[in-house]
C-alpha cells in the first residue's frame, strides 16, 4: 500500500 512506500522513503 502507499503507506509502505512512504516508509521506504
UniProtKB/Swiss-Prot annotation:
Modification type Phenylalanine amide: residues: 9
The keyword Secreted is assigned to this record: yes
Subcellular compartments: Secreted
Biological process per Gene Ontology, one example term: neuropeptide signaling pathway
Keywords, ordered alphabetically: Amidation, Neuropeptide, Secreted
Family of this protein: Belongs to the FARP (FMRFamide related peptide) family.
Name assigned to this protein: FMRFamide-9
Species: Sarcophaga bullata
Amino acid at each position: 500500500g502507499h503507506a509502505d512506500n512512504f516508509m521506504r522513503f
